[in-house]
């Protein structure tokens, strides 16, 4: 299993958790962004900088990821596309998107886009809380434990 990170909007604390997990497990992790993302010097941790542009990093993740990989992203349309490829998607708040939940998430996202387009101020997501950080780390550990059992 390879871990891919949609690093353009990934919180720093989540990146730190991921780097510690990669160091501990030896799994390959790749941060993909349209800007430079500094990563620790380790053979299994790398960063790919893609061109600037709408969804360029997302497209690179879709192109490179394979069934069984894990992607860290809060981008719901990207998650939907990856789930079709049988790629696991975990958001930075610790929610694992699934075939059963992604359609509802897409509908909510589209509804909020429609509201914003009509001039209604919907606000953005809340800042990442300590509970979110803990839930992300716990969910990541559960996923990695399952991978370890299959190796």
Swiss-Prot record:
Transmembrane segments: none annotated. InterPro entries: UPF0178. Pfam families: DUF188 (PF02639). NCBIfam families: PRK00124.1 (NF001095). Belongs to the UPF0178 family. This is UPF0178 protein VSAL_I0701.
């Amino acid at each position: 299993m390879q871990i891919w990170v949609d690093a353009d909007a990934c919180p720093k604390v989540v990146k730190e958790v991921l780097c510690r997990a990669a160091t501990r497990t030896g799994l390959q992790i790749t941060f993909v962004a349209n800007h430079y993302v500094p990563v620790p010097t380790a053979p299994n941790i790398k960063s790919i900088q893609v061109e600037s542009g709408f969804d360029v990093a997302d497209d690179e993740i879709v192109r490179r990821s394979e069934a069984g990989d894990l992607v860290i992203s809060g981008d719901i349309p990207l998650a939907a596309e990856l789930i079709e490829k049988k790629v696991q998607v975990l958001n930075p708040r610790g929610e694992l998107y699934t075939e059963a939940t992604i359609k509802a998430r897409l509908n909510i996202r589209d509804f909020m886009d429609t509201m914003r387009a009509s001039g209604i101020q919907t606000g953005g997501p809340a800042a990442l809380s300590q509970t979110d950080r803990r839930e992300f780390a716990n969910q990541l550990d559960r996923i990695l434990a399952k991978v370890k059992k299959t190796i």
